[in-house]
Design a protein with these regions (language model features):
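Catalytic cores of nucleotide-sugar-dependent glycosyltransferases that transfer UDP/GDP/TDP-activated
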Residues: 2-271
Length: 271
């Protein structure tokens, strides 16, 4: 088997766009390609026992206690303290792969008196400098934390309302899994493991656990963010329902471990 970390990525690498010159070979052997999504350590990433948070919470107390964590996040990062603002997080290596050119394009359009953005990460200087520029331009509503700090990451997941993962490509991705665990609604591009783990919100059936867009275009990311903002501000009950669905989603290694076991059992010679 050629094991990949998501079903969609296992398919994507058989295309010319993602195959890096091996697409034809991989298509020939496609019956040996298997996608198994990663899980996260649900002991480390557990909002009910997380000592780094201002207030721990489970799905029953999330709606109330995420507001406490939002206030603590705003205070610690120098943002205007206002529980009514929508806080959008971005926790990422600041590189081209992560879709940051799209983010740069849409920031001026999404920043308003109701919205705050928090960026955590390091990487290419062009992105570091652009986010610093935005922090200065949107004082009190934009934070560029140009470093990687695990404690701050925990507090962003707990304090933000939504998390951006607009990657150009993403074999699996873990940030969207952690976000859901912490009740932060993911806004993702439909690629690799992001497509496999985030089901788009359906307003008619009140289902799904995030907001998605398909083609790698800033206009589509902008639309996805605006759909999220519209639901957040105009239908909080449905938003809160999605937060609870996300927290109840199994993002542990349990299911993946069983798939690995089944794979290896299948490879074991029979007597």
């Amino acid at each position: 088997y050629k094991r990949q970390v998501s079903n969609t990525y296992a398919w994507e690498i058989q295309t010319e766009e993602y195959g890096e010159g091996l697409a034809e070979h991989l298509r020939y052997h496609n019956n040996k390609i298997l996608g198994i999504v990663n899980g996260i350590d649900t002991d480390i990433w557990n909002p009910a026992t997380d000592k780094l948070l201002a207030a721990d919470y489970d799905e029953k107390s999330a709606i109330k206690n995420k507001k406490i964590n939002k206030k603590a996040l705003q205070e610690s990062l120098g943002l205007d303290v206002d529980e009514h603002k929508m806080v959008i997080g971005l926790i990422s290596r600041l590189t081209n792969q992560k879709g940051l050119d799209l983010v740069n394009d849409v920031i001026p359009g999404i920043m308003d008196e109701h919205t705050q953005v928090v960026v955590l990460g390091t990487g290419d200087s062009q992105y570091e400098n652009t986010f610093r520029y935005y922090e200065n331009k949107y004082k009190g509503n934009f934070c560029a934390y140009i470093a990687y700090n695990e404690n701050v990451a925990h507090n962003i997941y707990a304090g933000c309302d939504a998390l951006l993962v607009p990657s150009r490509f993403e074999p699996c991705g873990l940030t969207q899994l952690i976000a859901m665990r912490y009740g932060a609604v993911p806004i993702v591009r439909e690629t690799g493991g992001l497509k496999d783990t985030v089901q788009p919100y359906n307003m008619f059936e009140n289902t799904g656990n995030g907001f998605t867009f398909d083609r790698y275009e800033s206009g589509l990311l902008y639309d996805a963010i605006n759909r999220a903002k519209t639901l957040y501000f105009e239908n909080r009950k449905s938003w809160d329902d999605m937060v609870i669905r996300d927290m109840n989603k199994d993002v542990s290694w349990e299911k993946s471990a069983k798939q690995y076991k089944d794979m290896y059992v299948g490879l074991t010679p029979r007597d």
